[in-house]
Amino acid sequence: MSDFEYSRNTVPKLDRSEVITWFHQVLGHPGQTRLRETLQQRYYHPKLRGQIDKFRCEHCQRYKLSGKGYGLLPEREIRIAPWEEVAIDLIGPWKVKVNNKPCEFSALTCIDTASNLVELVRIDTKTSEHIRDKFAQTWLCRYPRPIRCVHDKGGEFIGREFQWLLELFSIKDVCSTSKNPQSNAICERMHQTVENVLRVIIHGNPPKTMSKAKDIVDDALATAMHAMRTTVATTLGS
């Protein structure tokens, strides 16, 4: 047994199934590859890999989107220090039926381009003022002030209210015509993860009020963030 294997917890036979199921649910119903790599970073058993490969989730088989997945994010070297640059974008919309009436929800995503740390927050409107407030609450109030803020030419980002916030904090405005490929890939993964989580949560228990629908979307966003932070990051090799 290698030193790496000694550093991990051993999972008894009777507990393996429960551990696999628990991690699969907590990580937002990931695919087998991501589930296997994440579990094998923490636990050891000679038959663990085989049992993970045989694991089947009834909810995933019935309600997750079918077709080609988003795959792995490409590895790359870190060329900037953490907290220097944040890339922001909007993801969604996701459709949720409330009393059989379709409603749409979107979210603001903020990504530290060095570490790939992600923050997600549901938005009510796409106005520059609302996005400004959400960015301040979600990122600026929690982390060191970034040097640069990268975004596309969406009106919510180039609007007067959002630009005022960047000037107030002396953050360099970087309006990119071509989105950051790395951040764009993360946004796509976020979108699909949230949508899959929503499908699993909502099935059999559709929200009857708008308040309940918002709570469900918030739970899905939190699950997606947790999944991104705790699963193996292929871009950083850890």
Where are the model-predicted features located?
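A short, polar/charged loop-to-alpha-helix boundary motif
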Residues: 128-137
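Conserved beta-strand elements of beta-rich interaction domains across eukaryotes
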Residues: 93, 114-116, 154-156, 178-181, ...
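RNase H-like DDE catalytic core and adjacent DNA/metal-binding regions
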Residues: 1-118, 123, 140-147, 228, ...
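Loop/turn elements at helix/coil->beta-strand transitions in domains of secreted/extracellular proteins
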Residues: 144-146, 169-172
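Charged alpha-helix within mobile-element recombinases
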Residues: 39-58, 188-237
